[in-house]
Amino acid sequence: MREILHIQGGQCGNQIGAKFWEVICDEHGIDHTGKYAGDSDLQLERINVYYNEASGGRFVPRAVLMDLEPGTMDSVRSGPFGQIFRPDNFVFGQSGAGNNWAKGHYTEGAELIDSVLDVVRKEAENCDCLQGFQVCHSLGGGTGSGMGTLLISKIREEYPDRMMLTFSVFPSPKVSDTVVEPYNATLSVHQLVENADECMVLDNEALYDICFRTLKLATPTFGDLNHLISATMSGVTCCLRFPGQLNSDLRKLAVNLIPFPRLHFFMVGFAPLTSRGSQQYRALTVPELTQQMWDSKNMMCAADPRHGRYLTASAMFRGKMSTKEVDEQMLNVQNKNSSYFVEWIPNNVKSSVCDIPPNGLKMASTFIGNSTSIQEMFRRVSEQFTAMFRRKAFLHWYTGEGMDEMEFTEAESNMNDLVAEYQQYQDATAEDEEEYEDEEEEMAA
């Protein structure tokens, strides 16, 4: 069966990952000891996408947990579902990366990476037909960004034909945890552009906004934010785990969403998001789901899709609904907002329908969009990067770990190229496409 191997790294990655497993266990009826306690055969039918069945009927997540310090791992282990993970799959160092990308990528992380790869290999060998990897990490710190990208590039070498999906938490515009975030993020994007197949871009500020505005939470915690992320993560793979009328998998997703290989950074959204008090006053309909799903306030990263154009998008619906209605709604969105879609990719929205809704909801939908407006985020990080790099501020922390300034310059120009590519396709029209083809050929030559 099409298994997915889940990897989480660093503090942020481990906290998101822990929440994700709570959601997945809940959907498949697995209790915190790993025993099945559900009531529907459908929960077990394709449970092996994310779980390995061990002796005594226990289900063990196909998860690898890594960090350069033991703290977060301990809290995952003592958390509600901490006991279902395989103890050997916790790989951690003692020193920490101290928010330093170079430590995670070159020094501390490099020492630990082989033991992580051993665990990954062992898990991959347990798979019948491994479909790919999903990695949770943040790009602002040291471990998730530095060691996370190191692991991604190593896995790329060893499993070149498997899908590599990342859930990457970008530094947010107004909320900054560390001063050197722009450095860490730029160096990471440099890696992700080359080595990942699909990146779901998340950021804390957008998630906070959703919690404040839509969910009406007075004081959102990281737990609330991570819950939003895990709902989306579960939606991305629901087609693999439950039967549906229109299925999609990681590869179909990539084929439908990525028109040019470098442009694989997606915005994600989830619907229905309603505040706890007002849930019972809303009837869920496909039009309503669609409307909320495309709403810019619903996007989990701080870029406004109205400032750019969608190259492609994908909508995954869950629950009992008519596919005809889904198709009509999707067409409707495209016709009414045609200026926000590039016209040189006709029918650029893919939809899929899965019959089983998430627990507690009649129907739900997950949105993944490849929009040129995501350049706003890269541009913002790039400006912060340039401001510090021009003065060579904080560089000694990185050069001290053996990095070269050259690497910073390369990462910076790669990020700026990415922004320029998004801009180019945002401005492109169907008529002047021929010119681009000539340019592409020249570039290729």
Curated annotation (Swiss-Prot):
GTP binds at Q11, E69, S138, G142, T143, G144, N204, N226. Keywords: Cytoplasm, Cytoskeleton, GTP-binding, Magnesium, Metal-binding, Microtubule, Nucleotide-binding. Mg(2+) binds at E69. It comes from Eleusine indica. It comes from the Eukaryota. Coiled coil: none annotated. This is Tubulin beta-1 chain. GO terms for cellular component: cytoplasm; microtubule. Belongs to the tubulin family. GO terms for molecular function: GTP binding; GTPase activity; metal ion binding; structural constituent of cytoskeleton. It is found in: Cytoplasm, Cytoskeleton. Residues 426-445 are annotated as: Disordered. Dimer of alpha and beta chains. A typical microtubule is a hollow water-filled tube with an outer diameter of 25 nm and an inner diameter of 15 nM. Alpha-beta heterodimers associate head-to-tail to form protofilaments running lengthwise along the microtubule wall with the beta-tubulin subunit facing the microtubule plus end conferring a structural polarity. Microtubules usually have 13 protofilaments but different protofilament numbers can be found in some organisms and specialized cells. The keyword Transmembrane helix does not apply. Tubulin is the major constituent of microtubules, a cylinder consisting of laterally associated linear protofilaments composed of alpha- and beta-tubulin heterodimers. Microtubules grow by the addition of GTP-tubulin dimers to the microtubule end, where a stabilizing cap forms. Below the cap, tubulin dimers are in GDP-bound state, owing to GTPase activity of alpha-tubulin.
